[in-house]
């Protein structure tokens, strides 16, 4: 499960960059740039990918070379959905997809954080999850603020629903796969 999530974490800054490249709204652009900055940080080693690698270190997993044949179908579909929807030129699609990912992520990182705590991992092992609990909620709230300026525009809500439902369904599939995987291997 950790390897699958690593693949998602690796791709996320690039998906945000795709959203930035297709944005023509200053408020959304500002939010996306702040989001990307929180992902990559000022210094290598303090970016979210490096922090996640610390977590993998505690699990004794080496993901320095992700192996595509180890990725679940659900992981690949989630990545493609984020890539396609974040870089969509329609503001509604982009915002729906971004909100789906950020709001679900806040709940899921909290669950991982709680599970790691219960299983006795040291605090520095799950720092990635600790910092994301509040950050993801802030990002989701920022996206909703932008939506407030657009929701009355023609077709905005329909397009928002398209982006939201596509990414959300891929997230649900991903987390259901993770849950069933955990059950199969008796990992708790």
Predicted segments, located by residue:
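Non-heme di-metal
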Residues: 1-188
């Amino acid at each position: 499960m950790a390897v699958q999530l690593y693949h998602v974490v690796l791709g996320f800054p690039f998906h945000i960059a795709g959203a930035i490249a297709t944005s023509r709204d200053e408020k959304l652009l500002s939010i996306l740039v702040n989001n990307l900055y929180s992902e990559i940080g000022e210094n290598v080693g303090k970016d979210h990918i490096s922090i996640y690698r610390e977590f993998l270190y505690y699990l004794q997993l080496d993901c320095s070379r992700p192996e595509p044949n180890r990725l679940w179908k659900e992981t690949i579909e989630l990545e493609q959905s984020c890539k396609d929807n974040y870089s969509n030129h329609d503001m509604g699609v982009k915002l729906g997809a971004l909100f789906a990912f950020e709001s679900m992520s806040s709940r899921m990182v909290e669950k991982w954080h709680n599970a790691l705590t219960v299983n006795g991992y040291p605090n520095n092992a799950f720092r990635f999850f600790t910092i994301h609990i509040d950050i993801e909620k802030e990002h989701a709230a920022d996206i909703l603020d932008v939506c407030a300026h657009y929701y009355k525009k023609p077709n905005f809500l329909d397009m928002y629903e398209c982006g939201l439902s596509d990414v959300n369904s891929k997230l649900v599939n991903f987390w259901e796969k993770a849950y069933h995987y955990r059950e199969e291997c008796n990992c708790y």
